[in-house]
Each structure stands twice: as C-alpha cells, then as structure tokens.
Amino acid sequence: MEALRQRIEAAFETRQDISPSSVEPSVRADVETVINMLDKGQARVAEKIDGEWHVHQWLKKAVLLSFRIFDNGVIEGGDTKYFDKVPQKFADYDEARFKAEGIRVVPPATVRKGSFIGKNTVLMPSYVNLGAYVDEGTMVDTWATVGSCAQIGKNVHLSGGVGIGGVLEPLQAGPTIIEDNCFIGARSEIVEGVVVEEGSVISMGVYIGQSTRIFDRETGEVHYGRVPAGSVVVSGNLPSACGTYSLYAAIIVKKVDAKTRGKVGINELLRIVD
C-alpha cells in the first residue's frame, strides 16, 4: 500500500502533463487499482482512528488523476445513454450479485464506480458520486445526493432531497462526514467537510457549512464544522451584536442518547422544541 501511495503522489505532481493519450500504462494501472479498492470498500478516503477522523489525501489524488486519465465513453442507461469519464458502479451486476451484497437500487438511482455501498442499503432515485463511502443499513432517499468522497455511516437515513457535499478540491479539505445512526431531514444540506457526529437528528431544511454557527441553546456554546453527538438540530437565527439584524444559524435544541432514540420516534424528537 505504501509503494502504491508513493507512486500516486509522484504521478499527481505531473498531472498537468497527463492525458488519456499520454498517460503511462503503469500510472493508469495504479489509478485503476485505487478506484477498484474504493469501489470494494478496501480503502476509504477518510476513516476514524482512535476517535479521530483521518483523511487519506493520496486517495483523493488518485480520484482526481482518474479524471485526467480516462476519456469519455458511452454509458447505457435504460431508455437513454450517457457520455462520461466514470462508468456506472452497477453496470456489470446481475441478480445474484445484487442479492449477495444485499443492495436495493430503485431506478433511476445513479452510483458511479469508485464509490462503496454497504450491505442492506436502499438507494431510492438518488445520486452517489465516486470516492463516497455509504455504510451498511443506510437509506438514501429520493433525490438525495452523496458528494464525492463523502463518508456516510451505518444505519443513516438521508431523507428526500438531502445534499451531502463533495470535496475533491481544494485538496486539503476534509470530506463531509455523517456518522452512524444519524437522521438528516428532507432538503437539508451538509457541506464543506462538516462532521455530523453519531446519533444526531437534523430537521428538515437545515443548511450547515463550515461558516454556519451551530448554537447549543442549553450551554450557549457555538460550534463550527461539527455537530456534537446526539444533537437534535433545527434551523433558526441568532441576533447580531448590535441587535439590528439576525443571521441564519443551526440551533441544537436538545441532546438525546441512544436509549431515548430507541424509544422515541424521530418526529417526536423534533415536535417540541420550545
């Protein structure tokens, strides 16, 4: 793995000189190896080690190299055709393979090769970009999008129209991460490498980026780029220092533990926030 990483890093430094017609066969083979590893879940762009998320930038570099290496090609898609550099993940799947992996895919869901889909996931008509990791037991609901290299945990529900931001460039940025057992309400957007920690519930229509203030009304704390574990979050506003206007903020209205979540439905958690 270390030798592969070094070769990818070296190739990335010369990426401006790489094209589908000029790429060295060895570089193409290395990039294909990485894409296949990401596709099978043998590698992931970010992983939690000792309680902290670590980003493997070289894997992101391999994904970026793939756009310079692979040319557009025709992709069959039911009653139509597409023309793109990245093939479809399920293009070669048959019934036996879908059953073996425990994946349910509702047309016209689109998943690009190089993304991992865990067992017992359900993909409604949605979009999953390459480099993404969707763990087992997760529901990606209708018109939800999972951006490039985003990390989605186990037993997550991404409701209709949810947007999880991708982040290939700028390269130093971390991917957007939704940890295990989270619920993201309809039409919410979580972007720019924000981490939603385990067991959190995000209400409908909440928008969180790195500059969004995440206000905990119980403690008065303001967080940026991170929703603490077990938070129940709704959209709101905070007053300006001068008191003449207010600006959008995400408001943590309560905290819940796994036991409470197991006993109380999501709608009930969100119903009383006063």
Swiss-Prot record:
One annotated GO biological process: diaminopimelate biosynthetic process
S-S bonds: none
Predominant cellular place of this UniProt entry's protein: cytoplasm
Family per similarity comment: Belongs to the transferase hexapeptide repeat family.
Keywords linked to the UniProt accession: Acyltransferase, Amino-acid biosynthesis, Cytoplasm, Diaminopimelate biosynthesis, Lysine biosynthesis, Repeat, Transferase
KW Lipid metabolism (keyword) present: no
A molecular function (GO) term: 2,3,4,5-tetrahydropyridine-2,6-dicarboxylate N-succinyltransferase activity
Chemical reaction(s) catalysed: (S)-2,3,4,5-tetrahydrodipicolinate + succinyl-CoA + H2O = (S)-2-succinylamino-6-oxoheptanedioate + CoA
GO annotation, cellular component aspect: cytoplasm
Localization terms from the record: Cytoplasm
EC number: 2.3.1.117
CDD domains per the UniProt record, alphabetical: LbH_THP_succinylT
Keyword Translocase: no
Principal EC category: transferase
Protein name: 2,3,4,5-tetrahydropyridine-2,6-dicarboxylate N-succinyltransferase
Subunit relationships: Homotrimer.
Superkingdom of the source species: Bacteria
Pathway assigned in UniProt: Amino-acid biosynthesis; L-lysine biosynthesis via DAP pathway; LL-2,6-diaminopimelate from (S)-tetrahydrodipicolinate (succinylase route): step 1/3
InterPro entries linked: DapD_Trfase_Hexpep_rpt_fam, Hexapep, Hexapep_transf_CS, THP_succinylTrfase_dom1, THP_succinylTrfase_N_sf, Trimer_LpxA-like_sf
Sites where the protein binds substrate: 104, 141
